[in-house]
Amino acid sequence: IIESPDDLDKLRKSKYVQADASKVYADVKKILKEGRVVVFCGCGCQVAGLYATLKNVDISNLYTIDLMCHGGPSPKLFDDYLNKYHGKDQGKVADVGFRDKDYFGWSTEMTVKYTDGTVYHRTRTQDPYYRAFLPCISTRKFCGHCAYAKLPRTGDITLADFWGIQKYNRDYTDGKGTSIVSVNSPQGEKIYAAIADKLLLNKEIPCDDVLKTGQPFDHCFKNHPARQRYFEQIKNGSSMEKAYDYAIKDKYDVGIYGVWFGANYGSVATYYALHEIIRSFGLSVLMIDMPAAKTGAGKPDTHARRFAKAHYHESKRYTLKDMR
């Protein structure tokens, strides 16, 4: 919470990691009870969370701004990234910038500044944290089912980057960033009226044109299908590069071919023990299925098959012809 325009820099810049807003909620509640004005800015879920804590509190002095959200990556993953790749646990990290315009302009790239004055710059395809974040491989599971990335929005105003603005109107971009501002309520109208004449560009566009950009305005971004595999690899000790590569390309270190699907408990226990021993070495395992008699053949419903589905990664079933 800031009290002076001089401190606005503390609120600026993108922060692509989940934040704990619980203390801020208590502070906002206290300030509102004092009869003071509060402008709260956060993701849609954080705005909704704030309102949920303010029952029986006069909120006439509260103005809320929600951000169109890509989803929040795991805080532990971010902490591990800073420690393993940048030596945060050794006191080497001074600052992290997810979108540093000084180096990359209006874009999504990673900058880490070190205490010795050196700087790390990587594009979104080069940096392992960004590479997993943008396709929603590393975002939290519940972000893929967000209840707040929809219309009507939770905040009095919604803000977002207007990605693709040059396709809409080239005159509306200077390469430094153009924002979408959605006014959602009478409180939002008050805010916008107070700042409208201070904006460098102030053009009204149809809501349908915003929806066409594919932004998370009326829908959330779904988790990537490879998300679970990615975190399995991370949990098993893989680097972020290897976890991403194996999850995206469906790669494994070891393949086991045999009668692991055999309908007797001895076979099930033996192959499970082998599977777990290999995994204990930090290796990923694919259980290779027997050839199918014909293309598209299903798998029998046996206790061994049900056990395998719960504990293994299984290959598809191919005919001998398909495997050639």
Language-model-derived ranges and their functions:
Residues 1-250:
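Iron-sulfur-associated redox domains of electron-transfer enzymes in respiratory
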Residues 268-278:
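Short amphipathic alpha-helix
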Residues 38, 62, 254, 283-286:
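Hydrophobic anchor at the start of a short beta-strand
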Residues 54-57, 278, 282:
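Active-site catalytic pocket residues across diverse enzymes, especially alpha/beta-hydrolases
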Residues 281-324:
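Active-site donor-binding segments of glycosyltransferases and PAPS-dependent sulfotransferases
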Residues 252-262:
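Nucleotide-activated donor-dependent transferases that construct or modify glycoconjugates
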Residues 190, 262-267:
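Short N-terminal binding/cap micro-motifs at the start of the first secondary-structure element
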